[in-house]
UniProtKB/Swiss-Prot annotation:
UniProt protein name: 5-dehydro-2-deoxygluconokinase
Keyword entries, A-Z: ATP-binding, Kinase, Nucleotide-binding, Transferase
Annotated GO biological process: inositol catabolic process
The reaction(s) this protein catalyses: 5-dehydro-2-deoxy-D-gluconate + ATP = 6-phospho-5-dehydro-2-deoxy-D-gluconate + ADP + H(+)
Annotated Gene3D superfamilies: 3.40.1190.20, putative 5-dehydro-2- deoxygluconokinase
HAMAP family per record: IolC (MF_01668)
Organism, scientific name: Listeria innocua serovar 6a (strain ATCC BAA-680 / CLIP 11262)
Length: 325
């Protein structure tokens, strides 16, 4: 699989899904009830991956629905300031708001997120708002699992995947499982599997792959045996502090360690991992090196207060790897 084919296209990557607001506790080591001060950042896995890859120098676009208010304008301006193309960003005209995520940092081991995602704008992206002309201008389309949780966003994502395949666009699927968005695990398994069978690159944690398979305690070999019967060329399965594995349809297996760091919080790691892994592939690195990039980026982000603002540069990633090796 060659991510660098169609070099004449306008974008390296377009991400599809949610953009929301993260409100991260400024006061550490105390519960939410006692926290008085929060800092505001752009959040949401597809938005964070767009931001992470843009900071790494890729040409990036974004498709998603945001609120037509101050928070929506904050998100749009932040992304535009990073040269992320927002032509695929739609404003909700029915008064729906973007999701809000309040983070609680009691300790590095005890972090939690209080979500406000009732009737959120991103899940009302419609198939009619997906443009084939926009999608055919990218080399890779990245879709998020959370965007499959509800109609009409679900159908919008399925249309985007169909248009990507029609126009020889590589499809990357970031599982991005969030339990608060889904009705039940059976529904999750159905729609995750539907997209995974059409994806060229699949990235997720071991637990997220278990959700897709609707089981507990699955193993990597069974997962890849099933998925390689379909379209997948590369499957990345993350195992937290035990590191991550990448498998190819050609039968290769690669592993990267998790880099030690002073952990401040536990969220944001997955988005930075996906950003840096894809950047590595776009840069012509081998899969093993791309895995290292992902692990290093995740290590950097969990050591900092934000997720989107903390997305590292290529120099920061390479410096961490060099110092660790």
């Amino acid at each position: 699989m060659n991510l660098n084919k169609h070099s004449e296209r306008k974008f390296d990557l377009i991400t599809v899904g949610r953009a929301c607001i993260d409100l991260n506790a400024v006061e550490y080591n105390r519960p939410m009830e006692e926290t008085m001060t929060f800092s505001k950042y752009v959040g949401g896995s597809p938005a964070n991956i767009a931001i992470g890859t843009a900071k790494l120098g890729l040409k990036v676009g974004f498709i998603g629905k945001i609120s037509d208010d101050q928070h929506g304008r904050f998100i749009e301006k932040y992304m535009r300031d990073l040269n992320i193309n927002t032509d695929g960003m739609v404003k909700d005209t029915a008064g729906r708001k973007v999701g809000l995520a309040f983070t609680e940092i009691k300790s590095p081991e005890e972090c939690s997120i209080l979500m406000y995602r009732e009737n959120v704008a991103d899940l009302y992206l419609t198939p009619e708002e997906i443009s084939e002309d926009y999608i055919k201008e990218t080399r890779v389309l990245l879709v998020s699992g959370t965007a499959l949780a509800q109609s009409p966003s679900r159908e919008a994502v399925l249309k985007a995947v169909h248009l990507a395949q029609k126009n020889d666009v590589i499809v990357a699927f970031e599982l991005d499982y969030r339990p608060y968005t889904w009705k039940n695990t059976e529904e999750t398994a159905v729609y995750y599997s539907l997209v995974a069978e059409q994806a060229d690159v699949i990235i997720g944690t071991r637990d997220e792959f278990d959700m897709m398979e609707n089981q507990i305690g699955g193993n990597n070999e069974m997962t890849i045996d099933n998925l390689f019967k379909h379209k997948a060329e590369i499957i990345v399965i993350k195992h937290g502090v035990e590191g991550s594995f990448a498998y190819t349809k050609a039968g290769e297996t690669f592993r990267a360690q998790a880099y030690k760091t002073k952990v401040l919080k536990t969220f944001g790691a997955g988005d930075s991992y996906a950003s840096a892994f894809l950047y590595g592939l776009f840069s012509g690195e081998n899969i093993e090196t791309a895995l290292k990039f992902g692990s290093a980026a995740a290590s950097i982000v969990v050591s900092k207060h934000s997720s989107s603002d903390a997305m590292p540069t290529a120099d920061e990633i390479k410096a961490l790897i060099a110092n660790a090796d």
